[in-house]
Amino acid sequence: MENRLEELRKQHGITQEELADILSVSRQTIGSLENDRYNPSILLAFKLANYFHVTIEEIFMNPEEEQ
């Protein structure tokens, strides 16, 4: 699943480690999300959306819907 996580994180001026600490996950989880190697749980998706003050759909895009 494609996402804008890295873009949003950089816009907010925080590192992967800082975001991981805020969300109580590992830095590796954030890296895997940013590189499309991991799909988040619904709870983590909501935490990310709440932190960045956007909707889940503004972070995560379903490539199948774009076709």
Where do the PLM segments sit?
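Short basic helix-loop element that most often maps to the first helix and adjoining turn
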Residues: 3-22
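Short, charged recognition helix plus adjacent turn
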Residues: 11, 50, 60-67
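Residues in the helix-turn-helix
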Residues: 18, 29, 58
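Recognition helix of helix-turn-helix/homeodomain-like DNA-binding domains
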Residues: 25-38
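Short, basic-rich loop-to-helix N-cap that marks the start of a DNA-contacting helix
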Residues: 37-47, 65-66
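DNA major-groove recognition helix of helix-turn-helix/homeodomain DNA-binding modules
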Residues: 43-58
